[in-house]
């Protein structure tokens, strides 16, 4: 009898699984890559299959028992992973491909759909968020494009890929015992969460991803403004989002979730496996704060976020969960995860720069690429940002009514209008 290979589920995997169980989001990541010509489908299929050596969980199903959770190997062919849709209405097909659902319990954990017109292709990829965060997804895309390029050049190409570490333990191992104690005992000195009343009704049967772009000139202007005001681009994004929420809801008090990448704690020469290495901080704006100008709002945002950026307090929940999952039963650990991990209903995630030099598909020019997060269920609301070739894409995702989706599209435009000009 053949032994089934299994891989332990990390606490962060379980955390995302719980989010889907509790109807917060569908725990999928999404990307659209737009090319100037046709991809080689058979080469793409080979590349995806080879990439599973680096991330074997792609070809697994998730299994929970009373003893724990794991990823168990399944058998999938390339035809289960990559699909081709030939069409004269590419926008419609891209929208449909973007909202496909993966089956966590059955697998596979990735879906690639090539939307083909007579002259060009768009590649839509959906990845289970349990496997990777935004940075991990970019890491996977770079790997996929590299394998595709090498296989296109040499169809017999093969390489032995090592999965690497997926656990948060690799982050905590960087801290001496004294700092680990500090992580456990450091409490966030933060006001209670204030969720602004976003007017979303929700419709579980009507998912949609909405995105819009700014010009290179407008984004360059935003970067220049951030530098002049000793702020990060992320600070400017948060100020624009806070002002837009204030404009559309009339509320000043708000809490906006901000994911932070924990890879910064790893040695520079270490590349982790493709995984989730993210914690959360919160941008807090009080009812007494004055949001009368962009500059004032930026100052308030910086005052809230700056002390948290390098604070170990953000790691506390994740270190606690690592310990609980090690020492307690799975049932207790899962309940603890559900109780300890609670973030504001409104969030902004800056997935960051998609590196055009690392994302190269041989013989095809990549005209555009953006990544967006999971499809939310009301009242959860998120805006995501990515940049590619100096162009910014803002996106928002929701299982919602047509009225909800119109409201979200309008929100993105209002947010862009808040961007400062230099």
Where is each model-derived feature located?
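Short, charged, solvent-exposed linker or helix-capping segments at domain edges/interfaces
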Residues: 83-84, 153-156, 360
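Secondary-structure boundary elements
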Residues: 117-120, 146-155, 228-234, 243-254
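Alpha-helix boundary/capping detector
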Residues: 70-78, 149-153, 157, 166-170, ...
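Acyl-thioester-dependent condensation/acyltransferase catalytic cores
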Residues: 45-135, 139-149
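Short, charge-rich amphipathic segments
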Residues: 22-36, 69-80, 155-164, 168-178, ...
